[in-house]
């Protein structure tokens, strides 16, 4: 049986070894064992999202444009990935290609569902309390010499954290259940893989929203 050694502690009773079969690192090591191109660095694993014993998604990319990262990991007639599935007692495996374009990566991560569009949501600006202006009089103003200068204050732009990144994914109505997955698993794993909060909408709902928006715009112009 294959296990991942997650931690080793030394105490007075001797070393304690903690092992896991649910850690994503175990899946990574199994791919390194079964896929020579991963072990030699030609193909790299960008991220893994896993619900151990049920399903996992693995994002891979290639440093060689002539090497297909997904096909390489799947292997001839699926032999490589099947060996990993067998080791993990039938855990389903989705291997998707990682690309720098986040929209395409999200679409890949939702495989096997078809994606029509990915709309990124702007993060809400942080709410800051306005400071009350202090009443100043001429007596409170002090003069400074021309030779002294105050450093200019620069406000840093707020950093968008992973938790704030979100998008709406539009899929054909017939693909909605497939995109979401059983008990939401496909969407959940895709969100963890891409580090985006994903809201999946059917195309018909988005069209209705657009029609309503156009009607409201026409009414306001009249």
Question: Where do the language-model regions lie?
Answer:
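RNA-contacting regions in translation and RNA-metabolism proteins
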Residues: 1-222
């Amino acid at each position: 049986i294959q296990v991942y050694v997650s931690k080793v502690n030394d105490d007075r009773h001797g070393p304690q070894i903690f092992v896991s079969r649910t850690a994503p690192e175990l899946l990574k090591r199994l791919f390194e064992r079964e896929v020579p191109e991963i072990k030699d660095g030609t193909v790299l694993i960008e991220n893994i999202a896993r619900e151990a014993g049920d399903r996992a998604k693995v994002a891979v990319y290639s440093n060689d444009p002539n090497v297909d990262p997904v096909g390489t990991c799947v292997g001839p007639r699926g032999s490589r990935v099947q060996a990993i599935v067998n080791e993990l007692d039938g855990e389903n495996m989705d291997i998707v290609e990682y690309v720098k374009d986040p929209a395409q990566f999200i679409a890949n991560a939702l495989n096997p569902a078809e994606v029509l569009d990915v709309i990124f949501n702007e993060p809400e600006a942080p709410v800051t309390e306005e400071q009350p202006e202090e009443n100043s009089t001429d007596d409170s103003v002090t003069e400074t010499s021309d030779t002294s200068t105050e450093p200019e204050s620069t406000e840093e732009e707020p950093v968008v954290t992973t938790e704030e990144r979100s998008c709406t994914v539009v899929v054909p109505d017939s693909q909605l259940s497939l995109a979401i997955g059983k008990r939401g698993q496909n969407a959940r794993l895709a969100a963890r893989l891409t580090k985006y909060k994903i809201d999946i909408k059917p195309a018909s709902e988005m069209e209705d929203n657009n029609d309503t928006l156009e009607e409201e715009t026409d009414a306001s112009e009249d």
